[in-house]
UniProtKB/Swiss-Prot annotation:
Protein name per Swiss-Prot or TrEMBL: Peptide deformylase
Keyword Metal-binding on entry: yes
GO-annotated molecular function: metal ion binding; peptide deformylase activity
EC identifiers of the protein: 3.5.1.88
UniProt-annotated catalytic positions: E131
Function: Removes the formyl group from the N-terminal Met of newly synthesized proteins. Requires at least a dipeptide for an efficient rate of reaction. N-terminal L-methionine is a prerequisite for activity but the enzyme has broad specificity at other positions.
NCBIfam families documented for this protein: pept_deformyl, PRK00150.1-3
Species this chain originates from: Desulfitobacterium hafniense (strain DSM 10664 / DCB-2)
Lineage, top ranks: Bacteria, Bacillati, Bacillota, Clostridia, Eubacteriales
Cofactor note: Binds 1 Fe(2+) ion.
Family (UniProt): Belongs to the polypeptide deformylase family.
InterPro entries, alphabetized: Peptide_deformylase (IPR023635), Peptide_deformylase_sf (IPR036821)
Gene that this sequence comes from: def
Disulfide bridge positions per record: none
Amino acid sequence: MAIYQIVEIGSEVLREKAVPVKEITPNIAKLLDNMLDTLYDANGVGLAAPQVGVSKRVVVIDVGEGPLELINPVIIAKEGEDLDDEGCLSIPGITGQVARAAKVKVEALNRQGELQVIEGEGLLSRCLQHEIDHLEGILFVDKAKKTSRR
């Protein structure tokens, strides 16, 4: 296992649309393992592959309910609206108020290639949307109503 360096704002990979995973190989499994190690090392709740310099549609999340590993995630339903503060491991020292859906439903593959459906609200909903935005080259500061230094 390895801890990746987290890419910060200004890096091109954060602004690119990430490439879908066509086949779940041992390298994808290793990427998931190392991304989780990196997430925990950084005391984060979510991490997308572009944040570690890899343009793949891969996300790991742990909001305190155990790790979620998402390959090629897609938001299939949204409900309500919630305005709250967000931060990002790739934009240290900055927070911003971002409007997100209050609840989401996401489809993604797990590391075994099985389709899973994740329903989230609260922090999980916000984290799912934030990380999937990373896969589209979108950062929270692009959507923030206002930002401030921590």
